[in-house]
């Protein structure tokens, strides 16, 4: 090649206006061809369903199109939409279990065991839940899958145990839905004697409408209801302090201080203490729902840890502080207290009434109704998602896997909503019969211990997961969220659940104020043999076995987050490191 070849003038290609227009038209045409493929890719985003609504269709057509099956699934094999935001999860975690267990159930606890038993036992169960929720949060961030903790039990413990626990958990919330509808109607009797069926119909329609709008509607409704409960409980705490100090002009008792709690701190001895221990555990039912919702949370690695850390404040403020104040204001011998007589009133409402504050008891009764509606809403969500998760694990009929274009597990949801009509059995009581109470008591007895089985399984799953994770050479740095209590926290949580089962057995066998009898025992402990029957039956059918730690599948669906904190500046002093560690647990 000669030197002159490097000095050649560059050649330019010229285009006419006609050629330019032709090229632009071809480019536009090729971009149109690319657009559908980009939309198709959005369908395979893990856990997401396409949000693009079809153009040119009216509302009615789109409404019916939404019921058609989802076009594609996420990598966990489901088509649930990740529509829950961090704010939803935080309010669900704070207000999720602030409901009838606190506002109503604490009354029977106070009557059975006295104020000291209430404060001690609710604090102990709160510590147990603290360990359980952190263990659940770690696994939910690592495996944000449909079915949540029920799926973990199948995977890490044994498929037969997962089957038994999942069905027990489903039955619990399946029955709770119509029961809470009935409770809504009964609560209105504080103001009016309107037929209960009318209130049941109103609330049933409301719950159906909420579920028609999918998981986002559930999240928004729970956000609003939980906000009301949180504000109301804060308001009660402030008011209760004022009442105790004698600051209410209409309260002629003056300064109360600790005079009531000193009079009779305990009731019914050890039996009363055990009774409150189990009642307190039931009051925290629903705390674990944040783990079940992991498959529908947008960015679970950020949303779930924040929600988990709120549990400490909910336990410390809303349960312990409010119940200490209830113990200071209400005598366990009060005949109006739930558990002491035929006329039963919530201890929160009773504390306000005894201070002779006009109008405010009705306001707090409205808060109790809101809390019952919240529990009803959560029950439909929990039961439907649990049934859908079991279908994905082949532990329930496969048609319950059906998910529509809005990410709703449609058939599972319909079955749960239809069972809500069972609440009308309350009408059978008009002739003086207690048909509804008898039926609901025995239906609840089938799954009465589901909380203990579920929480214990979460702890055991976390222990096995951690051991297998270490055995197979993985580092905790790979996880997006790590429980600061580790395996030992889960061991303590598991131990507490075993204690709860023992206490429930004792109280069922030797009921307060009565002699041992078959009716009381099986209403309190029937769930144990039922769960065992589920376990043995599935074990015979599936012949499943428990894999060893080194062969346990912990990689499928595992979300790892290596080098997650590399950009964060490490504290330079020991005091700052301690402060960071403490704040990371609670904030």
From Swiss-Prot:
Stretches in topological domain Cytoplasmic: 1-90, 137-158, 215-222, 294-310, 376-405, 466-491, 542-580
Compartments (UniProt record): Cell membrane; Cell tip
GO cellular component: cell division site; medial membrane band; membrane; plasma membrane; plasma membrane of cell tip
UniProt entry keywords in alphabetical sequence: Amino-acid transport, Cell membrane, Membrane, Phosphoprotein, Transmembrane, Transmembrane helix, Transport
Membrane-spanning intervals of the chain: 91-111, 116-136, 159-179, 194-214, 223-243, 273-293, 311-331, 355-375, 406-426, 445-465, 492-512, 521-541
PROSITE patterns per the UniProt record, alphabetical: AMINO_ACID_PERMEASE_1
Highest taxon of source: Eukaryota
Function: Major permease specifically involved in arginine and lysine uptake.
Record's protein name: Cationic amino acid transporter 1
Species the sequence originates in: Schizosaccharomyces pombe (strain 972 / ATCC 24843) (Fission yeast)
